[in-house]
């Protein structure tokens, strides 16, 4: 039975796992779309959505505490600024569901399932 199993461990120590989620979340916030394995994407989704919700709540109230809280969680000022200035405005009327996970086949080397995780309602830039 899976009772009281909170999250995946990924065969890593807790510090390594937290660092991995932190790096993935910073990349997702900066680039708005990343490719990773499916279990990592599924584990990343609630982590990033909570950060976006924190940014939305504290932007509406215009509190410095929210920015400091996000800086302490993300440890990256550029990602924090983008989250507060761009993403919280974009998702002002959306109550959750800020990310989308799309399956993208399997990796060639070890046949691991690959997924694309992206922020919804993002601006698509043409490469012409």
UniProtKB/Swiss-Prot annotation:
One term under GO cellular component: cytosolic large ribosomal subunit
GO biological process terms held by the UniProt record: translation
Superkingdom of this protein's organism: Bacteria
Keywords: Ribonucleoprotein, Ribosomal protein
Record family assignment: Belongs to the bacterial ribosomal protein bL17 family.
Gene name of the record: rplQ
Cross-referenced InterPro entries: Ribosomal_bL17, Ribosomal_bL17_CS, Ribosomal_bL17_sf
GO molecular function: structural constituent of ribosome
Record Gene3D superfamilies: Ribosomal protein L17
Key word Ribonucleoprotein present: yes
Species classification: Bacteria, Pseudomonadati, Pseudomonadota, Alphaproteobacteria, Rickettsiales
Pfam family, one: Ribosomal_L17
Subunit and partners: Part of the 50S ribosomal subunit. Contacts protein L32.
SUPFAM superfamilies: Prokaryotic ribosomal protein L17
Protein's recorded name: Large ribosomal subunit protein bL17
């Amino acid at each position: 039975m899976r009772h009281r199993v909170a999250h995946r461990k990924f065969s890593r120590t807790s510090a390594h796992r937290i660092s991995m989620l932190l790096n993935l979340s910073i990349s997702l916030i900066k680039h708005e779309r990343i490719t990773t394995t499916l279990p990592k994407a599924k584990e990343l989704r609630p982590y990033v959505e909570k950060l976006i919700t924190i940014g939305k709540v504290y932007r509406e109230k215009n509190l410095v505490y929210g920015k400091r809280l996000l800086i302490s969680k993300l440890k990256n000022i550029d990602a924090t600024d983008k989250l507060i200035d761009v993403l919280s405005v974009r998702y002002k009327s959306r109550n959750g569901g800020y990310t989308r996970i799309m399956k993208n086949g399997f990796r060639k080397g070890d046949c691991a399932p690959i997924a694309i995780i992206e922020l919804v309602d993002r601006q698509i830039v043409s490469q012409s």
